[in-house]
């Protein structure tokens, strides 16, 4: 039970991490262009 919760939490954190990196890249790219 706890193992499944741990893997699910890791997966959620990983997706949030990727989303933040893509958002940061887009923001920095837009500021560079403008």
Swiss-Prot record:
It comes from the Bacteria. Keywords: Membrane, Transmembrane, Transmembrane helix. The chain crosses the membrane at residues 7-24. It is a single-pass membrane protein. Its main location: membrane. GO terms for cellular component: membrane. It is found in: Membrane. This is Putative protein YmiB. It comes from Escherichia coli (strain K12). The gene is ymiB.
